[in-house]
Amino acid sequence: MKMEDMSLSGLDNTKLEALAQDIYSDLVEDACLGLCFEVHRAVKQGYFFLDDTDQESMKDFEIVDQPGVDIFGQVYNQWKNKECVCPNCNRSIAASRFAPHLEKCLGMGRNSSRIANRRIASSNNMNNKSESDQEDNDDVNDNDWSYGSEKKAKKRKSDKVFLHSLKQHIPLNPNSPRRSKSVKHKNGELSNSVNADPYKYNYNTGINYETLGPDELRSLLTTQCGVISEHTKKMCTRSQRCPQHTDEQRRAVRVFLLGPSASSLPDADTMVESDCYDASDGQVLMSRLQWDGSSDISPSDSASSKASTNNSDSKKPKKKKKTSLGLNSTGGGGGGSGSGGGSSSQTSLVGLSNRKKKPKLPVPPAPSIYDNLN
Amino acid sequence: MSKDSKMRATINQKLTEMGERERLKELLRAKLTECGWRDQLKAHCKDVIKEKGLEHVTVEDLVVEITPKGRVLVPDSVKKELLQRIRAFLAQHAT
């Protein structure tokens, strides 16, 4: 080892440099030889010239170097100025605008249906004169329904096809029947126009109670919620159990529209009380009255027990079931105290019957039942 | 001189044993491909082959034609870098 060290350290720089050069040239020669072997093998195996194109093709695909043309020989805006005739509307359209035009013309693109729906929604808006900027309002969700739009509902299907084929020729006449893609409603069903604006519920059509007669109102009110929204003055078209309005509201509306005597609420809630009264089973009723003595007696209830015929008019803050039970308890208390109490229970029961009964029933068969009891 | 040759032999041996030679080779090959040296030389090969005729080309023909040209065509940057590395190695291991 010592000998090697001594020999190595004895080298001077020139020799080192020469050595470095030698090593370098060895490396380069290795690289060249490697290439030669590769090429030779490719030649002998026959794949050396495979990646070349033949001369003929070379001439065909040569790079074009003329002015006004790109390297493939194509003119840049060759089709820009050409015009095509639309097969649908037979107008001549610029080539670059042809595709979007066709989309709208045929009514088949994404945008075209959106625009059509929006147009219809805004035309309905103008027709119904509703206040339209209420997106974040609760009442927006009322399926308000316009009487006028019901007429247009019948034309909906034919309009759809007609509308699409003639779309671009429709003048901006909002009242034209062709443009009325309608807003036909059953309870809770959405119209087409809603789909165009997913964030705006269909608020622009609703029942205007002023236009309806009393019979119509009554029939409406028996099936629908009917609560009049403050903002649009229209009636809610949802079912009787619509979650947006309370029973109190519904009752108030009926009182308002139909008059005090005719208010009726065919609710499922009150089945317990009204049905058993209708069955005229006084005993059962009495037992029910005595059963529930624990519910609160609202002040309006005691007032109603005095005013037997008109207690349905009073607006009770509590929910219906509770107030009716409260009434029961007063009746029960009355019943328990004997004949004097019996008469008061009679009146309270009369009040009960008035509130729950349908308007056509005669007021009290109650005295006859309690004659038996007494 | 024999000392020199002995010394050279030693160094070469060290170069190989430590794997530095292989590394340098790979480095050179990569750099030459990168800078287009390979393609240039290949084109030259094509000419030679077309000249000599496809069937009768031998390895010797190619080597004789290609190697001198190859040596010349190596770009300066590649050469410098390689020499630098070799000198570094020598400096580290020769003294």
Curated annotation (Swiss-Prot), chain B:
InterPro entries: TF_ENY2 (IPR018783), TF_EnY2_sf (IPR038212). Keywords: Activator, Chromatin regulator, mRNA transport, Nucleus, Protein transport, Transcription, Transcription regulation, Translocation, Transport. GO terms for biological process: chromatin organization; mRNA export from nucleus; positive regulation of DNA-templated transcription; protein transport; transcription elongation by RNA polymerase II. Pfam families: EnY2. GO terms for cellular component: DUBm complex; nuclear pore; nucleoplasm; SAGA complex; transcription export complex 2. It is found in: Nucleus, Nucleoplasm. It comes from the Eukaryota. GO terms for molecular function: transcription coactivator activity. Involved in mRNA export coupled transcription activation by association with both the TREX-2 and the SAGA complexes. The transcription regulatory histone acetylation (HAT) complex SAGA is a multiprotein complex that activates transcription by remodeling chromatin and mediating histone acetylation and deubiquitination. Within the SAGA complex, participates in a subcomplex that specifically deubiquitinates histones. The SAGA complex is recruited to specific gene promoters by activators, where it is required for transcription. Belongs to the ENY2 family. Component of the nuclear pore complex (NPC)-associated TREX-2 complex (transcription and export complex 2). Component of the SAGA transcription coactivator-HAT complex. Within the SAGA complex, participates in a subcomplex of SAGA called the DUB module (deubiquitination module). This is Transcription and mRNA export factor ENY2-2.
